[in-house]
Amino acid sequence: MTEEPTKENLGGPKSPTPVTMEKSPKSEVVVTTVPLVSEVQLTAATGGAELSCYRCIIPFAVVVFITGIVVTAVAYSFNSHGSVISILGLVLLSSGLFLLASSALCWKVRQRNKKVKRRESQTALVVNQRSLFA
């Protein structure tokens, strides 16, 4: 077997052990290493989009909620209480409501954190302004 050098990511943490091993038809073992990604690299790559999860969940939650309403309405229009389709409709309906509620909760927490940061920065500005004029 011949060993080929692997290309490593600069600045990224190195994977201590190979992650995936595949066998080719010629009885050769191909080792694929997957680099670990840090939170800083993720933020740099996504532009901070991982902190806006509540914005991504809203459209998905609305679609799931509407689907749940439709499936539940169809199931109960045929008087099939307790059937698989009615249970599926209720699960979709409750999942949509849960996703909408969690999105609203995340939005409220984020707004509260923004207010706190804004208040802290205003306090720091006022303190700096007083020290300049004192």
From Swiss-Prot:
It is found in: Cell membrane; Membrane; Perikaryon; Cytoplasm, Perinuclear region. Coiled coil: none annotated. The modification Phosphoserine is found at S15, S121. GO terms for biological process: angiogenesis; arterial endothelial cell differentiation; BMP signaling pathway; cellular response to BMP stimulus; endocardial cushion development; epithelial to mesenchymal transition involved in endocardial cushion formation; in utero embryonic development; Notch signaling pathway. The keyword Cytoplasm applies. Residues 1-24 are annotated as: Disordered. The keyword Cell cycle does not apply. The chain crosses the membrane at residues 56-76, 84-104. Keywords: Cell membrane, Cytoplasm, Developmental protein, Differentiation, Endoplasmic reticulum, Membrane, Phosphoprotein, Transmembrane, Transmembrane helix. It is a multi-pass membrane protein. One of its GO terms (cellular component) is perikaryon. It comes from the Eukaryota. Plays a role during embryonic arterial endothelium differentiation and vascular morphogenesis through the ACVRL1 receptor-dependent signaling pathway upon stimulation by bone morphogenetic proteins, such as GDF2/BMP9 and BMP10. Involved in the regulation of nociception, acting as a modulator of the interaction between TRPA1 and TRPV1, two molecular sensors and mediators of pain signals in dorsal root ganglia (DRG) neurons. Interacts (via C-terminus) with TRPA1 and TRPV1. Interacts with TASOR. This is Transmembrane protein 100. The lineage of its organism: Eukaryota, Metazoa, Chordata, Craniata, Vertebrata.
